[in-house]
Amino acid sequence: MARNIKVEELLQTPIEKQQIELVERKGIGHPDSISDGLAEAVSRALCREYITKCGAVLHHNTDETQIVAGRSSPKFGGGEVLQPIYMLLVGRATKEFEGAELATESVALKAARNYLRNTMVNMDLERDVIIDCKLGTGSSDLRDVFKRDRVPMANDTSFGVGHAPFSELENIVYNTERQLLTDLKSRMPAIGEDMKIMGLRDGDDISLTICSGMIGRYVDDLDSYINMTQEMKTYTEELAARYTERNVNVFVNTADNLKASCVFLTVTGTSAEMGDDGSVGRGNRCNGLITPNRPMSMEATSGKNPINHIGKIYNLLSTQMARDIVKQVPDVQDVYIRLLSQIGKPIDQPLVASAQIIPKEGTSFANVKSEAEVVIDDWLSNVTKITEMVIRGELNTF
């Protein structure tokens, strides 16, 4: 059956030539990102458990995970959590298969602890956090969808959005958080995982504002704190120079009051220890960024089942399509993908698969159009590949 694939030329100023561009990334220790990470870790663990015990992924969604902030007393050289962070794993899961009960809550709790242990390395899981699990049972109608031996049927009438390639600013913002928390943190353990990077490009001038919770036990005093934040600034300036020749100004923890020694210190590395709650889907989109200059879906991607939940599959799929078009089709400057499903219809037959392309100057759009159609059709023909990639942990969702 022919697919409704529409590729059109977009008469719009390319992102790099627009006057103003804004890009944001919430770091992996931001309360919203922790919620995303927990939800996705639980979903992937349930997928593996279902495959092992049942031979296939059964119905589940864990995309309602919530974090309620605790209270803490951070200080130079130490500090303590006074009231633990409360983390609630919420959603639906299939708890019985062919008459046998499945230990879904135990699987979820183990996955959550493992995720926190590997991500929030300064969080004491015995003292600093309470993890609770409330997984209901999915409806029989939805569970039946997973039993059909064919391409899964869409769970909803919804859409997914993706774009490529990353702009200079998008690359800078994304990689600043990643490199600060991997490369620089390996030498400066005081850097907390709770970090926000906000990028502004005004013409050829880029401003990066970094908000980073430092971990008190690794910071001896105010002078040490100042030296560390200055090193973060210098590191980021050098990193940004790899991606752009534009002017870059970096600002770190601009809310600090150095005269009053009032600075951004934490005990665990996340502001969830003191006043900041978190929810799934309030942070980064599945490409790892928040990009108001680009089309975006407001759907949470993390925690949704990877079989037929359009909010997950089509956002991931559209992003992969866009990236492959840029890789495989010459002379594409910007590409935007939108996929729209119809509830109950096969996910490889979207109501429309739309690509809007800004070609490079002097390019024949007819050639670009036909090649882009092939990429889109090929991905839709192999749509379940996204499911396999998610279960194997090959695709990030935030």
UniProtKB/Swiss-Prot annotation:
It is an enzyme of class 2 (transferase). Its cofactor is Mg(2+). Pathway: Amino-acid biosynthesis; S-adenosyl-L-methionine biosynthesis; S-adenosyl-L-methionine from L-methionine: step 1/1. Keywords: ATP-binding, Magnesium, Nucleotide-binding, One-carbon metabolism, Transferase. ATP binds at residues 136-141. Its EC number is 2.5.1.6. GO terms for biological process: one-carbon metabolic process; S-adenosylmethionine biosynthetic process. The keyword Magnesium applies. Disulfide bonds: none annotated. It catalyses: L-methionine + ATP + H2O = S-adenosyl-L-methionine + phosphate + diphosphate. One of its GO terms (molecular function) is methionine adenosyltransferase activity. Pfam families: AdoMet_Synthase. The keyword Transferase applies. Belongs to the AdoMet synthase 2 family. Catalyzes the formation of S-adenosylmethionine from methionine and ATP. This is S-adenosylmethionine synthase. The lineage of its organism: Archaea, Methanobacteriati, Methanobacteriota, Stenosarchaea group, Methanomicrobia. The gene is mat.
